[in-house]
Amino acid sequence: MLRQAKFEDAQAIQNLICFYSEDGKMLFRSLEEIKQNIAAFRVYEKSGEVIGICNLKYGWDKLVEIRSLGVDPRFHRQGIATQMVQDSIHQALLNQDCDTVFVLTYAIHLFEKLGFQIIDKINLPQKVWNDCQQCLHQDNCDE
């Protein structure tokens, strides 16, 4: 079941973020940061367990970023990430200040399958790059 994250989900969200951030596939987010931004997270819950996460970041020139998308590896290839991306697009476009949804990702095939197009990051506003300063790959970005 896909739903809005609750404060009680913060630790489960961080656990998935830590799993993916260990090998540089996702930016680390502290538990405090997650709690402060819990309203921006959506989770996929199965049998009472958070097995998927996604975060939307609003705010740059009518752009919305899908970020911190991750699914517990035990549940890969079941369409959960696809559902979460489709839900994120829907949520983002409900906001009248949004006309473009983007993502910086290694999961290129997933997003192309869902209609996203590859663009050069240079076309994104400089403000988008703030998170890049925390990334392990900032000097050799391959997203």
Regions found by a protein language model. Name each.
Residues 43, 49-58, 62-70:
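Conserved beta-strand in the GNAT
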Residues 93-94, 112:
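Non-catalytic positions within long, well-ordered alpha-helices that form the structural scaffold/packing
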Residues 127-143:
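Cysteine-cluster motifs in flexible loop/terminal segments that predominantly coordinate metals
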Residues 1-28, 45:
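Short amphipathic alpha-helix that is part of the acyltransferase structural core
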Residues 39, 97-98:
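Short, high-confidence coil segments that cap the C-terminus of an alpha-helix
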Residues 105-131:
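Conserved active-site alpha-helix within GNAT-family acetyltransferase domains
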Residues 33-46, 140-142:
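A short helix-loop-beta-strand connector motif used in the catalytic cores of GNAT acetyltransferases and
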Residues 71, 77-92, 103:
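Conserved acetyl-CoA-binding loop-helix of GNAT-fold acetyltransferases
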